[in-house]
């Protein structure tokens, strides 16, 4: 992949949703809930947002939980990614 986000943005790749429920029911593609867990694949340099300096706290490889419906989805070389602001990330999974 060759994409470099500007400012306080990060590029994430969503983790695949579960194919089965906890009780063993297989879900068709449309019934799967969109995952809110992703892996950070690129990080912008940070910058000034609304007059405040934003330092990047995320690093490539972090597993994160992000806000639903945030960011912009893009497809590059057949892979789907989401570009969003660092502030749309709710937590890092350790």
Swiss-Prot record:
UniProt-annotated location(s): Cytoplasm
A Pfam family annotated for this UniProt entry: Cpn10
Any GO molecular function: protein-folding chaperone binding
Main location: cytoplasm
GO biological process terms held by the UniProt record: chaperone cofactor-dependent protein refolding
Source organism, top-level taxon: Bacteria
Coiled-coil residue windows: none
Signal sequence region: none
Cellular component terms per the entry's GO annotation: cytoplasm
Keywords associated with the record: Chaperone, Cytoplasm
Gene3D superfamilies referenced in this protein's UniProt entry, alphabetically: GroES chaperonin (2.30.33.40)
InterPro entries: Chaperonin_GroES, Chaperonin_GroES_sf, GroES-like_sf
Physiological role: Together with the chaperonin GroEL, plays an essential role in assisting protein folding. The GroEL-GroES system forms a nano-cage that allows encapsulation of the non-native substrate proteins and provides a physical environment optimized to promote and accelerate protein folding. GroES binds to the apical surface of the GroEL ring, thereby capping the opening of the GroEL channel.
Assembly information from the UniProt record: Heptamer of 7 subunits arranged in a ring. Interacts with the chaperonin GroEL.
Similarity annotation: Belongs to the GroES chaperonin family.
Protein name according to UniProt: Co-chaperonin GroES
Naturally occurring in which organism (per UniProt): Clostridioides difficile (Peptoclostridium difficile)
